[in-house]
Amino acid sequence: MDRLKTFKRIMEKSDSNRVIILTNHYQIKGNVYDCGECNRDEFINLTNVRVCNVIDSYDGICDSESSFDWLHINIDKVVAFSFV
């Protein structure tokens, strides 16, 4: 099964679309937006997004957080994720 299908299956089982995603450099929090006509096989679409440098997020306080209405993340860049 490909990574995006696995991601979506876990989202369905968790009964939440709120996610924290870690890449090598960023901690990303947002709501998964599942749009059938706009989804691409390799991207996770998020709304109401907050992005923080991973190094800044270790102590739980992010001094340089950025906010976005929309963010599209390449599934191949995801290191870890958790639905909350």
Tell what function each PLM region has.
Residues 1-84:
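Conserved RNA-binding domains used in RNP assembly and mRNA/RNA metabolism
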